[in-house]
Structure formats: C-alpha cells, structure tokens
Amino acid sequence: FLFQPFTIPSASMEPNLYEGDYIVVSKFAYGWSSASLPFNPPIVKGRLLKRTPARGDVVVFRLPRDPSAAWIKRVIGLPGDTVQIRGGQVLVNDQPVARTPLGAARDHDAPERRVLAVRETLGDGRSYLTYDGGFGQPGDDTGPYRVPAGQYFVMGDNRDNSLDSRWPGAVGVGLLPEENIIGRAEI
C-alpha cells in the first residue's frame, strides 16, 4: 500500500518519461483515497492523512471519466490558481512560467516530427523539460482556468501530444479531483 509500480502508457510525458518506461508511485505522498487502493473501491470519500501536491510534481491518477484507467501528468495549477496558455506559454496567476529554448529535438514517439526542447522553470526554481511542437497547435491558446478547491490543473510535458486539463473531461482530463490521485511518481 506504500508503493506501486507503474508503466508509462503514452508519449504525453516525453522527453522526461517514455511510453513503456517503468516508475514507482509513492502512494503515501499525499495521503490515501479510494483511488490509491487496488480496483478503486468507493469506500473512502476524500483523502486520509491528506497532503497537498506541489506545483511541478508528477502525479499518477485515475482518469475521472474512466476510473479503471491510470494516467500520469505534471501538476501545473493548485487549488485557487488561475492557469492560462497563450501562444504555448503557460501562465499561472498571470505570471509566465519561465521558458528556455534548448534547440530542436526529434519526437521519440514520431521520429519524423521535429519539436523544440524547452526547459520550464517554476517560481520556486524547480525545472523540467518539455516538448513544443510550434505555434498554432491545439491547446496553445486557452481561456483562463480557475482551479477550484480540491482540484488540480495538470499537463503532459509533451505539450502538443497530451490530453490533459486543457481539454474537457469527456476528451482529456479536465480539472483533476484530488481524490483521483493515486500518488506521486518517483522517477
């Protein structure tokens, strides 16, 4: 009940995690919910021994529309935050997340596709790599999302190849309820 192995199901977290990679999920990092238990039994409402994910954490969670599916994304917006994407630039509470272009890269999932490798650095100094497919990609421009209490805004690091909180729950993740979080990815 403390740790769980997890296989990366898609290319949405490239260039940091690749489809088929194995990681360990710390199920106690944020406390427990029914999502932390095998088969997702609806026996617990909310989280026990609740701790809050930090912006930049990579979390594994049960997809709200299909609790049998486990997905992985990076936490971008916390409860109370406003998140918006303008021209591919992530803004949290109207502050742009710092971006440093690193040069062209080949998309591992589609080797014929060239992307821009970018280092994003959060306000607290945490940084990570992302892929940017260029201007005009779906999801590059959004309205503001106000993250309500008990929910999170999550994104894949392969920004133009990720169904995440930029997309409504019927297609992507929508805003992620905290009780759907299984745990933190320990990479």
State the predicted function of each range.
Residues Q4, P15-I187:
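Soluble "head" domains of membrane/secretory-pathway proteins
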Residues F1-M13:
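Aromatic-capped interface at the extracytoplasmic side
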